[in-house]
């Protein structure tokens, strides 16, 4: 049963692995083994099985088998079953037979062995999320708290904490019980600390929390031992953070302890609590912030001072604190010049946040003192190249980049200061180059980087053995050259020094340099590097991918040299690269549902390459339409025909029709980029911005042609929006063609001497616009990295898809309805980067369509232009990455139908992503003879 239902989730990764049924059978054999070692090995492999096959039927069967082992096995096996339950918490709600699972585990509570009972209590606590309101379990936990065995009591405390987090009724019922145990004089300090930690979850809401807080505060005086006080502080802080309304009182209490308690560990615990409550900075009273500054000033312990600064670091993320941070700013200004570089770095970070906020809100502020402090910190960290100084250096460099972003006048000074420190080696050199690259990636790169150019060239002549440092060095040079190319024409002579510097480095370093060159539109340099890399590729897939990148980069380089004349050849090269890029990424076998080319299967680089090929082909059509005015002059009757048709552009003859067709092709290219952006769920923000910019640019070009060939030539609605303003140097490069087209359009249509219709002046403007569009745009990061942007999702459809011939179609009487059941799994993907979190799947939109087949004898049927007779849409919420849906399908006419099911993701912001995958089955609807109303002869007895 399991194998039949789960085999449709076939994995196309190419890794020879077992299916779910075989894997479960193998683990079951291990569980039934008479050797404890084999049983343990089988038990610990279950979490991996759940991650790979997170299907309810498998998980339910597995947990029932584990419950049997827990009931019949020894304590050692029970311990490993407990670990499996703790590690597989997100899959627990897929257990279907909860009662049977609970019965098998609960039976161990009747054992005479207190360790077995303790393990049972901990196991019940681990699965509290699926049995939160079971009264028999609540009673067992209460009975465990009254036990005379310490192990069982500790297990009951753990179970209490777990159940209280899921059941408010249980939390309220157990609050008095735990309070009595805490106040009991016979309770030991260690046990009391555990009970106090349990009180964090049993407060039962803001109203009930008042009594718990009162109890915990009384414990601070009644039981002054360090362990009890620290446990009470932790519990008080957690409850205040949960209820929010008690944050001001708790902040005052913690500050009082931090300033007056003589014990270092207690003061540290109070400061750690303040660090957690700093997330609610808007609720802090103003005098508490002043007291925090006073505590930091009076502290003689370096660790406590650092904790105070870290609390300030979180507080200043609130704009209200930044606006009224006079004393805080003064303290950080002094601390930023401290001899302790760690303190100075954190204080500088706090001060930078305040100053940047003032610049952004146009408040009066002077960043000169901060600039001096940051420069001094960078120089001070150079005195010792040890690893202890790298962290302060990175904080200072990050602050410099933020300050330059808020106030560009400091950019040149910062670049010069960083370039002066480039003589260092190792991690310090990487940090400095990374800061220069971050500085150059902004909009002020043209003004900032030339100041560092002499030092960068000197470093390039003596390149470091560190591959990452060399890549960063080349990236900074690419940024400087790219920013210069936006305003002037530059020669290619500088590329020789780059090639000489990377000639003898490893292939991975050269590949990263080539990717950076592609991002900043240095296509000829990237093509040279990629050509050599493709000849040295270690595998066939790598050779395909590198060859695809080489062809595409060479096509863009040729486009820069030849201009419009190279459009056709460049389009063909990009088309070839799109096929090779998909194969090189290891994709192309289709998704698990067996579709062909859905957005969930297609890798982002190959799809972007195909879109670029179609866009260049559309530009070639636009250029040909402009030339057609000269190569195919209008006939003599064209003017009369234009007057009769009331179409001024028709006077241009064939050129007008060609221009309109080119406009439609450009609009189609823009729609293709838009569809690509809507399917790239896991793409980084930079890649999505590039796709939106490409969509906007080709939409703008299409509107330009439509305006030329229209009758009124009125100004269309503006395409440029505030969301498409460049924020980085890469976006400036990508938006350069759009800005050029806008200038050409304004020059043409704002000129009063421009005659209406399609004249030679219009043709020259089209050629100029196409030439501007041919300028080599930078590549998106996701395309350079070969990253798949589609969402990883697998679908299984019941009834399962069958072979293509119509004879194998599922039969459906017209009077009946087909019950479709869809099950799917959202698969994890590798993280994009440390700086950008992954988008979360909050919902899955399921679209079911039924499309009739045309009556034809053809073996292959094209359903693109046939409207569906049924469209049903529903949105389901994934539970632990698993989702399921059901849909009834009915048709009203006999024949063959393709029933397609497509999934689309809904992210945390409510945006819909057309990620796929798409799966379908063919059904054959027929009339039921019993419903035709034909009377059948009654058979007689004789």
Predicted feature locations:
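Extended, low-complexity, acidic/polar intrinsically disordered regions
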Residues: 1-842, 846-878, 885-916, 921-942
